């Protein structure tokens, strides 16, 4: 863990040195006016919000976040999905030549963590150190290119939270009162009675009250604590949602948020008595109260961007406002109601977009340790490979609807798209001795090949294919701008399928046997090679290692692997492999073709057999 934290510190230092995260020491009360706009210049609570977010200056980095993950349990495949989604979005911007930053990390305070530490007979901080390291290991294992691994126990974050609290208090938005209600430890929040139902444990017969939304048990709590006047911001929130209907992806979740704010918005309890929750950030000026974990956690996003040390109007240097928050659908309310309300209260810019993804299930059931159907991402990557898992997560993962995880289906997808798709096409283009990709590229460069319609079927098929290639990068970019990486990846793989069909129909292995066939064969191989080269460039954010191997196999120079080069006939230097990959190629056959294991050891050599997928399990809902 020390090595990982050192790497994180180096990344943070790099941004500081570049002027991106300009930090000073803690801002005292007497100096705060230097960093916070005067009251006269601040918006009042009644001021309307009519734009999505301010137009950021050109030097603002594209800022992506994943959720910060609770350390009360080990990482699972759902955590990996959030991380990979965020990583793909960041890498896409980097591919386009834009400055981009990614923040991930761990949420280390709260009742859940406190109870888990006690259950493990550990000091809370030691417990957090141990489990936070597991998430750092996951990020490293699945090649997450983060710029900071945030921990809510980090001192700069603790200071940011206290500063935020004091400003809310200064504006009269915090008051103390008795609070009573149904509290869910698992979800770390109170629920109104309208959001509760009675349930019965199928094993013990116990009847209990649970959240309709999450299904987790709630308990009745009566205590005195601090509240945030969130209802004072109701009109501003609703106006913001109205003016920014595409703020949340998918659209259906925006409807849920608007309905909640319209019908259920209450002032928010934002502290807990130390007698009940001692593990957390203490309320400034009141050591008897601990700041509510979700207020603490949400502020991590602006801590990363340098808050509270922003000279007026310069928050963009640290990346704020965030361009995309990647979250799971289970934390929608916190990010789309509580968070914008807190930001509006302090006149801070709101996030530009929220990508709220669905969950991974097993045989249409929620993954649960008690059932034994939780997929361990480390074992899965060991079995299938890092980039195969990244591919499967994005290609088959759900945004609007849950996706069903299946080792059987993962193997099917691997064979179809990677082994028989990319692998087969790369072998067809680069291996045969009857033709040469380099010769084909050079022939076009020398002006010996004119790609224009002649009325001859194979030649015209080449021209049509090249024309489609010319539109691909912009099509994929549009999908990414719409926060739909799954569709983007599916369209790239569609190109691979089309190119395999093209080369099968053209049959260069037949044509090459004919006299004076070299020019036509070169035309076919160049067309297929261009498809592979462009696909390899566009696949880099999704499968960084395998895409690099593909481009090495094609002999594409590093400086020619940018989004600008994802157009046909712009690289005249490739065609001679930098390295080869043996008989099995880039995508060898799966370790086991008959994998049936569905449990927590999925992908592990230790795993034998588990539950079979349901007979109706075809393709996960995307």
From Swiss-Prot:
InterPro entries: Anticodon_Met (IPR041872), Met-tRNA_synth (IPR014758), Met-tRNA_synth_2 (IPR023457), Methionyl/Leucyl_tRNA_Synth (IPR015413), MetRS_core (IPR033911), Rossmann-like_a/b/a_fold (IPR014729), tRNAsynth_Ia_anticodon-bd (IPR009080)
Binding positions (ATP): 369
Bilayer-spanning residue ranges: none
Keyword Transport: no
Comp. bias (Low complexity): 610-622
Family according to the record: Belongs to the class-I aminoacyl-tRNA synthetase family.
Sequence motif 'HIGH' region, location on chain: 67-79
Molecular function per GO: ATP binding; methionine-tRNA ligase activity
Positions of region (Disordered): 592-622
Gene Ontology cellular-component annotations: mitochondrial matrix; mitochondrion
A Gene Ontology biological process term: methionyl-tRNA aminoacylation
SUPFAM superfamilies documented for this protein: Anticodon-binding domain of a subclass of class I aminoacyl-tRNA synthetases, Nucleotidylyl transferase
Catalytic activity as recorded in UniProt: tRNA(Met) + L-methionine + ATP = L-methionyl-tRNA(Met) + AMP + diphosphate
Organism per entry: Neurospora crassa (strain ATCC 24698 / 74-OR23-1A / CBS 708.71 / DSM 1257 / FGSC 987)
Compartments reported by the entry: Mitochondrion matrix
Protein name: Probable methionine--tRNA ligase, mitochondrial
Leading EC class: ligase
